[in-house]
Amino acid sequence: MSDALLIGISARIYHPVAPVPGFGGIFNKTLHYLEQSVAHWVLQPHVLALMIPPVEREGLVQAGQMSLADYAERLDGLVLQGGTDIAPESYGETPLAPDWSGDRIRDRYEIGLFEAFVAQGKPVIGICRGCQLINVALGGTLYQDIPTQLDSAIAHRDDARFESQFHEVSLVAGSRLAALYPGVASAEINSIHHQGIKVLAPDLEVEAVAVPDGVIEAVRWRGPSYLFGMQWHPEFMVQRQFHPNQLDGAPILNEFLAAARTRRGVSAPSAVRLGAVG
């Protein structure tokens, strides 16, 4: 498949901070990994997914001569996957609690990836943490903990239910996201986050908000290339029999892949269709 798109996925990072009882060997090493659902979501006909290992030159993660710009030059698009909190230091704050310290090493790595792909005009899509990282990279800030800092907030995370935690979102009328779902003013999405966008970056516009608390759920860049972030996990949208009004992730994926094909200059195969609202 010489014409296959090559989509990079940012890595989660496991840091062996302290010995884990009952574990050893590989768990004493720094690990780069991804959750398989996000890879399976990206893998479509004529699309290959590759995890991009961190190439941090300072701190715990070291690299040779390869740079993030080399990946951006070779790959056709970037998915910033979910995971651990963003460190408050990445947006000019200090942690309000030790549990909200986040991962500064991963922040630097993913911000570098983000900047490299944007500089190349390659499309970028952010999922959950990835959406928050886009906002931070462009100058915005976050709620370190929505329940603590926003009294009117609904439940955005339930560890016991995880991806089975759903709530309603409203699509902003006239937005490109709304255009992907004709006739859909609101829908259900899964919700697995306790942080969220507080101050929106100047170059972003809001495309979806949570109902009824108004927490920002989707953003898009006003710049020249494709850049979209969503607070939910489209790769986890699987419980359709229980949530028939959930937002189908296929139109968003198709738009992202179309942007990658346009940037590369290749024709598109048949669009993905998963079968939910939209």
PLM regions: where:
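N-terminal beta1-alpha1 cap of cysteine-dependent amidohydrolase-like domains
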Residues: M1-I125, V136, Y143, P147-Y181, ...
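Active-site loop->helix "elbow" adjoining a glycine-rich segment at hydrolase catalytic centers
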Residues: R129-C131, L138
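Active-site-proximal beta-strand elements of phosphoester/diester hydrolases
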Residues: F228-Q231
